[in-house]
Amino acid sequence: MANSQLDRVKGLIDSLNQHTKSAAKSGAGALKNGLGQVKQAGQKLILYIPKDYQASTGSSLNDLVKAAEALGIEVHRSEKNGTALAKELFGTTEKLLGFSERGIALFAPQFDKLLNKNQKLSKSLGGSSEALGQRLNKTQTALSALQSFLGTAIAGMDLDSLLRRRRNGEDVSGSELAKAGVDLAAQLVDNIASATGTVDAFAEQLGKLAMPYLTLALSGLASKLNNLPDLSLAGPGFDAVSGILSVVSASFILSNKDADAGTKAAAGIEISTKILGNIGKAVSQYIIAQRVAAGLSTTAATGGLIGSVVALAISPLSFLNVADKFERAKQLEQYSERFKKFGYEGDSLLASFYRETGAIEAALTTINSVLSARSAGVGAAATGSLVGAPVAALVSAITGIISGILDASKQAIFERVATKLANKIDEWEKKHGKNYFENGYDARHSAFLEDTFELLSQYNKEYSVERVVAITQQRWDVNIGELAGITRKGSDTKSGKAYVDFFEEGKLLEKEPDRFDKKVFDPLEGKIDLSSINKTTLLKFVTPVFTAGEEIRERKQTGKYQYMTELFVKGKEKWVVTGVQSHNAIYDYTNLIQLAIDKKGEKRQVTIESHLGEKNDRIYLSSGSSIVYAGNGHDVAYYDKTDTGYLTFDGQSAQKAGEYIVTKELKADVKVLKEVVKTQDISVGKTCSEKLEYRDYELSPFELGNGIRAKDELHSVEEIIGSNRKDKFFGSRFTDIFHGAKGDDEIYGNDGHDILYGDDGNDVIHGGDGNDHLVGGNGNDRLIGGKGNNFLNGGDGDDELQVFEGQYNVLLGGAGNDILYGSDGTNLFDGGVGNDKIYGGLGKDIYRYSKEYGRHIIIEKGGDDDTLLLSDLSFKDVGFIRIGDDLLVNKRIGGTLYYHEDYNGNALTIKDWFKEGKEGQNNKIEKIVDKDGAYVLSQYLTELTAPGRGINYFNGLEEKLYYGEGYNALPQLRKDIEQIISSTGAFTGDHGKVSVGSGGPLVYNNSANNVANSLSYSLAQAA
């Protein structure tokens, strides 16, 4: 029996649903097709009653008329019979809704037939309705639902029409839009009232929020929403719609007395997981409360069914976007406080957009979710008690259509919010006479100066200059870009803005716009002019700065609601820098972007042309092409501060000193600053989108191709510091000063008196002709001196030093296990710390040994005037040993002196000392001098160890090896060493990296000077 009743009820409900859906579908179609008629007739719902109509059994014509009048529905009694009237209005007797000249027609016979199809359901509804709304019966409920739905549809269509006209350029006043927006909101409230079940039930909910229920028809928006929270925040027009939607949805969720009163969903307050849970709880509790009021079952099983259906109807995923909007608004508002003090409120404007659209999104999402949950809950309740009601069917039928109308209206509201922001921007620009977005970049820059002041103020001291000219670039700002896109002002913004600031004594100078901004730095024309500055100066690009030129933007439509603001760069081919004329200066171009790729993938580069002054300058170059006219003074070009690629420096064709061509090879592993075009996507609602193109930069490979070459021309540059990669240097016929910096470099001095530094890495350095100075630096280096007098210093590492020609040569091994080869001229050898091997030549050689050195092996192949200087050892601290044909010199360690070969104190091995050379070759060192000036001659050592004497070792002091009491060999030795050093021409003091602040050159890395001074000092002390 129960099953048959259940089947019957389900069948009746399905039938009612089908009729209602069909009616609603017909109504929606009629609305669309009859929009023009509606506007002419007014937004009215008219109940048409034919003269031959008699109400169905169980209903009365008077009830129908009273219900219509209570709801403000016009009643029209026709003189025509039902069939004629139906065909005139609807074309058929089966339709529920249609259009007449006076408004929307509701056919009474068909409506009555729908409501009274099942007597049992009608009676059941009557009891429930009476308990909740007294005389407001099923007829009034159904009429109210249809009336509010149709009103919302018409209001929404009217609103869309007004917006469309405005977009097409027609003069649509704000008051018209405001009225249409308010009408839409009013009809929305009526819809919710119908969906709740009865008007009284909805009034009861709102009454719990202290809003008195005034009239059954809910006529007058102020009466409907009086005393609701947060309404004071709503402005005119669409702002009112936004506020109304928020408070309506909030009141709907929070109406239940058992719900968490602190939960403020969809009213502009944070939506969290807890709130999402309470939404389901509130709706479930409300449905159960209705069942109690209706005297229906509230068993645990029924409650569980209701709760599960409601939970399925409300998806937390639908609220994620809402929560994101409110969180974004919160973050933006906090962020905006930093820049308001600098006169920019764009971030706050953007926050307001997210707040308002978030409120709209929250309201509509919540309303849709609650309507769906309400419909699902009513259906579950009906199933649980084997009863149903026409209102449940009506709710189920119309909620989907209502949701569609709300969603369509949302886009229009979003666009209105965006328009409001655009109007505020226009008002600001009119008042201040300045681009709003440029003002945003100005504020960003002011904050940047505030944040980096400590760093920037240190440049004066760090670079030893009186004035710092600091150039910075505010790159594309996503917040500024988003605001420009939302307000449809993408063509009014730029990719950023470049700034110039001045510091003296660590203090920021007040700028004089005409003098500083326009004259000193012009990024549109690509000009920098420092010629008026009469101080030692640093020009520094602190942040990456875009290529010079003008940006042009064009906004165009790419789809129905899609727009693109395209970027075109009218770029300059070069920067021109006019330097400080009468004072030393530093120019740091390492952050000045020279390489660019446009949106089509075409590559280009911008040259930097520098005209420097008459004093000592330092210039730090980047990865693109440069032309440097350094002028007088000692000028230095640096390539090691950024990745400039694999470099070749060539001065072989130079006609003047300081002329070089620098070729830059940017391979795949070279990462350089390059300018690129990117796109920011901005959405205004679901359908409208803006794309903005802008310039940005990346640090990534930039392989040159298509005939593009990176090449520098250096003029009057006295000194060059290479890159941190493997470089090649080819000197000129003039004096060259090269520094390899890091990397395994190849350096060829060629002609001229060259000064060549390998620095870090395993370098190969050829001095070429001329008096050259070669320093290996760190790493295992190979140094080769050519014709002329050479000074070679291996530095740290296992180095090889060679000289083949030259009258005077200095060979310093430095730390490490080195090999030194002398020439047939006069050589000064100093192997340094480590175990070294030294090959003397046929000329006059001087070998220097210190007690901290390791085991040195000397191969002396000729000459008859060689000297070994024990620079900090006396003869009492050494012993001489004959081992085969070799002479060993051991040094005392810890007071003990041993006379055998395998001994840590073994200092020197002079190979083949006792071996007769071919054709009288002399393998001996003719004189050995200790730190006190005492000396011993080679023949005396040979005689002591002659065959038959039985002596193969002895202490120098014991054998009285020194000649002549009071005779000192050091003065003459000092003269000899000084002659060798001065003859190399390497210590004139006029080279090295420039110290700008001192006003003159500073010898850099001049270990040769250090050694010479050390030798001279030790000899002077001994003398």
UniProtKB/Swiss-Prot annotation:
- UniProt keyword DNA repair present: no
Q: Which UniProt keywords apply?
A: Calcium, Cytolysis, Hemolysis, Host cell membrane, Host membrane, Lipoprotein, Membrane, Palmitate, Repeat, Secreted, Toxin, Transmembrane, Transmembrane helix, Virulence
Post-translational events: Palmitoylated by ApxIC. The toxin only becomes active when modified.
* A biological process from GO: symbiont-mediated cytolysis of host cell
Q: What's an example GO cellular component term for this entry?
A: host cell plasma membrane
Keyword hit for RNA-binding: no
Topology versus the membrane: Multi-pass membrane protein
Q: Which is a Pfam family this sequence falls into?
A: HemolysinCabind
Give the Gene Ontology MF terms in alphabetical order: calcium ion binding; channel activity; toxin activity
Its primary localisation, in coarse terms, equals: secreted
The transmembrane residues are 226-256, 297-326, 367-406
Start and stop residues of the Hemolysin-type calcium-binding repeats = 730-747, 748-765, 766-783, 784-801, 812-829, 830-847
InterPro entries assigned: Hemolysin-typ_Ca-bd_CS, Hemolysn_Ca-bd, RTX_C, RTX_pore_form, RTX_toxin/Mannuronan_C5-epim, RTX_toxin_determinant-A, Serralysin-like_metalloprot_C
Localisation per UniProt entry = Secreted; Host cell membrane
Briefly, what is this protein's role? One of the virulence factors of A.pleuropneumoniae, which has a strong hemolytic activity and is cytotoxic for alveolar macrophages and neutrophils.
Miscellaneous: ApxIA is partially deleted in serotypes 2, 4, 6, 7, 8, 12, and totally deleted in serotype 3.
In the UniProt entry, what is the domain comment? The Gly-rich region is probably involved in binding calcium, which is required for target cell-binding or cytolytic activity.
As for family, the record states: Belongs to the RTX prokaryotic toxin (TC 1.C.11) family.
- Name of the protein in question: RTX-I toxin determinant A from serotypes 1/9
Q: Which organism is it from?
A: Actinobacillus pleuropneumoniae
The taxonomic lineage of its organism, from the top, reads: Bacteria, Pseudomonadati, Pseudomonadota, Gammaproteobacteria, Pasteurellales
